Amino acid sequence: MSLKIRLARAGAKKRPYYHIVVADSRSPRDGRFIEKVGSYNPMLPADHADRIRLVDERIKHWLSNGALATDRVARFLGNAGLAPKPTYNEQPKKSAPKAKAQERAKAAADAAAAA
């Protein structure tokens, strides 16, 4: 049984509220779970104390028993200091325009300056 620490959607339409739960990875998003270990209310301001609530002791227990956090929950745990912050690959840099495109852009700029 593969365990995940993930978000389970609750709340009303257009008013999201999430429970942070430990669940079998095969169960539905809002379906059966093993234990509720926190909550996330995205409707509250970012600096509000109750926006993200975590039960540290139980999360540490489940992580030590092999549960894996999903991307969003891993970010929450990293910010709370319960797990290392996830690393993200840097986006590749946009390639510079080729020579013909640079010549065309320069010609257009010269024409606009002359006019």
UniProtKB/Swiss-Prot annotation:
One of its GO terms (biological process) is translation. Gene3D superfamilies: 3.30.1320.10. GO terms for molecular function: structural constituent of ribosome. GO terms for cellular component: cytoplasm; small ribosomal subunit. Keywords: Ribonucleoprotein, Ribosomal protein. It holds the Pfam family Ribosomal_S16. Residues 81-115 are annotated as: Disordered. SUPFAM superfamilies: Ribosomal protein S16 (SSF54565). Belongs to the bacterial ribosomal protein bS16 family. HAMAP family: Ribosomal_bS16. NCBIfam families: S16. This is Small ribosomal subunit protein bS16. It comes from Gluconobacter oxydans (strain 621H).
